[in-house]
């Protein structure tokens, strides 16, 4: 049996880029909660003792941007300089302007257009992916890397591993075999964890705790064997972390946000963007389409692409590829997709309820992945029943 290795990575909520994603989405939540018609394009950057939010926002909402920044940093665990940022004493800069009227008239006619007439907020192409190798219909390498990162945060916040600090990265290499286009995980080849820690803990303690409290609860025993390689804080020291260790910026973890390198990516980031930005809403609807195809039994593995022009409601193209795993030809699956999914931005907002903010809805998406999550707020993860006829044997 011929096999191959594939690797996916993830980062914790305390990684500086992910901190920025979460702040941008916390701002989006605050705007949409008060004004569902808010137009938000919020970026965040951070470095030692500094967080800046900037971008274009048109909203009737009354938003305290500085409070959102400080609350988000504090909730992650950035409460003192020694962990990389002090939420209560860092400098916060806000540079927010209104959305360009040129963009506004092209996209929604200054709110005069009906939902089905609303144009895409920009050009671009987005991809959705699904695979039957996990219950989440997501790639195993990505699922494990993501869950390891989430587990590190859990055991840090519940006090199981008091030496843990907010910043950290994970990476998992899985050995696969290709079964006529479907991906079959065989074993976990390598587990890599690099996590921020306090001064007092030893490397041996770190390795022991990571195996016991992070790896064992996350990675099923059937995937681990005596040949599995573990790199646990291989640099030997990771005390300086968060924005003190590295600058952070919204939108720099787009592969972590999606499929861990599987499928494809159009390049557009998600966080801080309202649903007229098809970088986000388009990627959400094609994930639902790909997931529904696999869940319905039409294929074992699937990628869906959609593309847009700014100001134009109808997509320019829709593409489906099942990697040879389809029960019927891809051209027939494409017809089913077009019949069952409305790719117009205004209708995606309605059908996926994307104008609803508040309660940390979009903030939740900004750490540990936008897809494969079991959460009612992730409406794009709901499988849509697809009707199709089995070909005669």
UniProtKB/Swiss-Prot annotation:
Name recorded for this polypeptide: S-adenosylmethionine synthase
Family under the similarity heading: Belongs to the AdoMet synthase family.
Subcellular location: Cytoplasm
Keyword tags: ATP-binding, Cobalt, Cytoplasm, Magnesium, Metal-binding, Nucleotide-binding, One-carbon metabolism, Potassium, Transferase
Manner of cofactor binding, per the entry note: Binds 2 divalent ions per subunit. The metal ions interact primarily with the substrate. Can utilize magnesium, manganese or cobalt (in vitro).
Role of this protein: Catalyzes the formation of S-adenosylmethionine from methionine and ATP. The reaction comprises two steps that are both catalyzed by the same enzyme: formation of S-adenosylmethionine (AdoMet) and triphosphate, and subsequent hydrolysis of the triphosphate.
Gene this chain is encoded by: SAMS
Sites where the protein binds K(+): 43
InterPro entries: ADOMET_SYNTHASE_CS, S-AdoMet_synt_C, S-AdoMet_synt_central, S-AdoMet_synt_N, S-AdoMet_synthetase, S-AdoMet_synthetase_sfam
EC number: 2.5.1.6
Binding positions (ATP): 15, 167-169, 235-238, 246, 252-253, 269, 273, 277
SUPFAM superfamilies (UniProt xref): S-adenosylmethionine synthetase
């Amino acid at each position: 049996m011929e096999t191959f290795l594939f690797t996916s990575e993830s980062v914790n909520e305390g990684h500086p880029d992910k901190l920025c994603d979460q702040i941008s989405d916390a701002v989006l939540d605050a705007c949409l909660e008060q004004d569902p018609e808010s137009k938000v394009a919020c970026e965040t950057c951070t470095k030692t003792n500094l967080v800046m939010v900037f971008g274009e926002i048109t909203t009737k909402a009354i938003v305290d941007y500085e409070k959102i920044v400080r609350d988000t940093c504090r909730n992650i665990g950035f409460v003192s300089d020694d962990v990389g940022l002090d939420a209560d004493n860092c400098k916060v800069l806000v540079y927010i302007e209104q959305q360009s009227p040129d963009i506004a008239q092209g996209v929604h006619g200054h709110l005069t257009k009906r939902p089905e007439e609303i144009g895409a907020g920009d050009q671009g192409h987005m991809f959705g992916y699904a695979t039957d190798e996990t219950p989440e219909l997501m790639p195993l390498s990505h699922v494990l890397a993501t869950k390891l990162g989430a587990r590190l945060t859990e055991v840090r916040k519940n006090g199981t591993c008091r030496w843990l600090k907010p910043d950290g990265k994970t990476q998992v290499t899985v050995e696969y075999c290709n079964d006529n286009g479907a991906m079959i995980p065989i074993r976990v080849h390598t587990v890599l964890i690099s996590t921020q820690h306090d001064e007092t803990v030893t490397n041996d303690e770190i390795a022991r705790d990571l195996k016991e409290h992070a790896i064992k609860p996350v990675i099923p025993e059937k995937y681990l064997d005596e040949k599995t390689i573990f790199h646990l804080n291989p640099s030997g020291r990771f005390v300086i972390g968060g924005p003190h260790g590295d600058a952070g910026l919204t939108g720099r973890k787009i592969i972590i946000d999606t499929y861990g390198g599987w499928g494809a990516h159009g390049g557009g980031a998600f966080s801080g963007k309202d649903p007229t930005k098809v970088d986000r809403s388009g990627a959400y609807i094609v994930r639902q389409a790909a997931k529904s195809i696999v869940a319905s039994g039409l294929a074992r593995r699937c990628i869906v692409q959609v593309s847009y022009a700014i100001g134009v409601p109808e997509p320019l193209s829709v593409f489906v590829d099942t990697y040879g795993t389809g029960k019927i030809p891809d051209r027939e699956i494409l017809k089913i997709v077009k019949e069952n999914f409305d790719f117009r931005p205004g209708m995606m907002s309605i059908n996926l309820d994307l104008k609803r903010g508040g309660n940390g809805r979009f903030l939740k998406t900004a750490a540990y992945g936008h897809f494969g999550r079991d959460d009612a707020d992730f409406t794009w993860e709901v499988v849509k029943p697809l009707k199709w006829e089995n070909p005669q044997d």
